[in-house]
């Protein structure tokens, strides 16, 4: 397997007329059709001719467990407001932490579960969910419990 680094990362490798062999739900082998040999346990063939097959997305840094969106702050940042100005208007991480702290674990779980399901529908196959918006031991532990529940209840 070759790893890309530096300028090579800007090149998109393409395999044309290729196969992907899936075994037990995982990619076991990839190659060119001209090199295809007899593979064991082929029970289902998907003809992807004239189609594109891309890998699933792995999101290695998410904060999926939070109380509410902060899209108004994003607009404020675009308009040039500083973080201090946003905080003075009642926004920022302190507002997020307060909203999160006021919510029950079940409420946070349902919101995060919905967000996770949307990620999966959009092609995410692996995700790392981080805490960090609790700003107190109690809230951070609540976030971690929600993350644990999501892990137990999710396919990824």
Give short role names for the model-derived ranges.
Residues 24-26, 31-34, 52, 57-58, ...:
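Short glycine-rich, polar/acidic loop-and-turn segments at beta strand-coil junctions
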């Amino acid at each position: 397997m070759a790893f890309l680094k530096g300028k090579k990362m800007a090149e998109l490798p393409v395999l044309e007329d290729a196969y992907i062999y899936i075994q037990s739900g995982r990619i076991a082998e990839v190659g060119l059709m001209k090199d295809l040999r007899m593979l064991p346990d082929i029970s289902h063939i998907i003809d992807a001719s004239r189609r594109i097959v891309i890998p699933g997305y792995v999101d290695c840094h998410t904060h999926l467990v939070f109380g509410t969106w902060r899209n108004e702050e994003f607009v404020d940042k675009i308009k040039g407001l500083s973080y201090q100005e946003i905080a003075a208007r009642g926004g920022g991480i302190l507002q997020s932490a307060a909203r999160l702290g006021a919510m029950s674990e079940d409420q946070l779980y349902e919101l995060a579960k919905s967000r996770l399901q949307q990620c999966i529908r959009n092609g995410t196959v692996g995700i790392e969910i981080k805490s960090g918006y609790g700003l107190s031991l109690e809230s951070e532990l609540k976030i971690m419990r929600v993350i644990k529940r999501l892990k137990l209840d999710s396919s990824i």
